[in-house]
């Protein structure tokens, strides 16, 4: 994609509210959209908020500097949930990011602008961050690929935090190879992009026992087709609620600590949702935070043991399709299946499934540090599903 063509398309789709700021960069390289938590030289970093000064950054975050070394061109900074505190990208300061699949519905969050940029064809790929599902949720709702690599794969220096124990930089793209290449470029890894896919029959895939319940009609129908097609066995697995609680307790305590001074000095600069969310996070007891820290390694070990003999586990990315912008939005079905894998730190792809209606995403979850192997598995599933065999 040429940067001039990308800018022209962006101008045509201004009503989607995808970007907060644009760059004036030129060049022949891959066009990349960057979530506005990440420092890009010459642009401010807002975190989707009005708390911070809007002064242009003098330096790139290291991951952006690495991308420039590969010839990438940054088109702009994408809209998001304020301070990444949400799963809708309905931003009170910079506008609601609209889902390119249906303009009356949310794009998901918190990396909604990054997902919408890919879905709308404005960039070659985009960068998001994922602390409790913020790459995978909008990827699923917008019908694109989202890749959250193993925790700490990509340097988060120059990335504003939500939770230092959980924050993970990831990629969004229209296909597995591009999403994998994006993460590999940011991480300075070689050999990650799969040259070929393994035979589907050679893969050992499963679903965590007792996890997948309460799906809406569209997601439920797609999941039944996928589980039947792949003949997924249910395997014993640590409880979803226990893993998700560990993630939420870490996130809440660390976010509350980071925002404590601003909440005290300038609460009026926060939107109502972010302010209420942060104030609620102060309710996490110190004992719960200590338990979440202490329990993380044992639960990681339990998950690794449960996956022994399997290449990956699959679960829906969200329990529901993209909600309507108007009306009350229940975030629980959007975050139900994602937070667990931030707590464990495992690599995860969200792969889109074509339906006759709104997009649906399926998570493909691998082992810690085996991101390249997971990319090959995701490619195999993408090739099957893009051929229509998993359509509902």
Identify what each model region corresponds to.
Residues 71-75, 121-125, 310-313:
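Alpha-to-beta junction loops
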Residues 103-115, 129, 133-134, 138-139:
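Gly/Ser-rich catalytic serine loop of serine hydrolases
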Residues 2, 65, 120-125, 129-208, ...:
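Structural helix-boundary/capping segments
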Residues 50-58, 95-110, 327:
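Short pre-catalytic strand/loop immediately N-terminal to key active-site residues, enriched for Gly-Thr
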Residues 34, 74-79, 127-129, 234-235, ...:
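General beta-strand structural signal in soluble alpha/beta enzymes
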Residues 1-26, 185-335, 343, 383-392:
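Amidase signature
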Residues 31-33, 75, 204-208:
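Short, well-ordered beta-strand segments
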Residues 1-56, 61, 83-86, 322, ...:
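Short, well-ordered alpha-helical
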